[in-house]
């Protein structure tokens, strides 16, 4: 029943149709496009990290519009190659994945951040229980936020998508302590 409803929504979704026409892998591209049109956080020559990248539409947009940008993407799921994107398939929360990022980004304990933008569209496998799904996503967001604090240059940008729920306000409060605009 739910998969039939999803198929129906996809068939009637103008963003799904637009993504197909414009060559984006998913409708999610328009979320990052809309945010960038409002806040202008991407520029050519930046270093961008895309966590939870599959199927790749956020990285695809950045690579397409800002071709001189270095993009490092990571996801548990494989993505088809995107010109200008270095991809790692693995669990962002694992030591191995973090070592890969540290190496690619030249991050050490003694360096300041080297990244201009960290974006996270990570989502857990959902179980259908809203509170549980929300809490699982908040754990992933906290990992992404902690990484952003270490990896971002001064004045860098952290972009994250979240399910709404009870734990959101606490994380937003923490983020506001470190970023000017939230």
Give, region by region, the residue ranges found by the protein language model.
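Class I SAM-dependent methyltransferase Rossmann-like catalytic core
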Residues: 1-46
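A generic alpha-to-beta junction signature in SAM-dependent methyltransferases
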Residues: 42, 65-66, 105, 109, ...
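Conserved class I S-adenosyl-L-methionine
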Residues: 44-54
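Glycine-centered, small-residue-biased loops immediately flanking beta-strands
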Residues: 46, 69, 156
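C-terminal substrate-binding/active-site "lid" region of AdoMet-derived donor-dependent transferases
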Residues: 49, 82-83, 88, 118, ...
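Conserved SAM-binding loop of SAM-dependent methyltransferases across substrates and taxa
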Residues: 55-67
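The conserved SAM/SAH-binding core of class I Rossmann-like methyltransferase domains
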Residues: 72-74
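S-adenosyl-L-methionine
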Residues: 76-126
């Amino acid at each position: 029943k739910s998969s039939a409803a999803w198929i129906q929504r996809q068939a009637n979704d103008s963003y799904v149709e637009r993504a197909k026409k414009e060559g984006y892998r998913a409708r999610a591209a328009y979320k990052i496009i809309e945010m960038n049109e409002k806040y202008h956080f991407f520029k050519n020559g930046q270093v961008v990290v895309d966590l939870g990248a599959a199927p790749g539409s956020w990285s695809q947009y950045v690579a397409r519009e800002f071709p001189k940008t270095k993009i490092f993407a990571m996801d548990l799921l494989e993505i088809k190659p995107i010109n200008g994107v270095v991809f790692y398939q693995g669990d962002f929360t694992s030591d191995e994945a973090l070592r890969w990022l540290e190496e690619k980004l030249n991050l050490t304990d003694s360096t300041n951040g080297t990244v201009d933008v960290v974006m996270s569209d990570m989502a857990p496998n959902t179980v259908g229980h809203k509170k549980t799904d929300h809490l699982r996503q908040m754990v992933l967001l906290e990992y992404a936020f902690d990484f952003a604090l270490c990896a971002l240059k001064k004045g860098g940008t952290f972009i994250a998508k979240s399910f709404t729920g009870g734990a959101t306000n606490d994380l937003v409060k923490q983020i506001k302590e470190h970023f000017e605009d939230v």
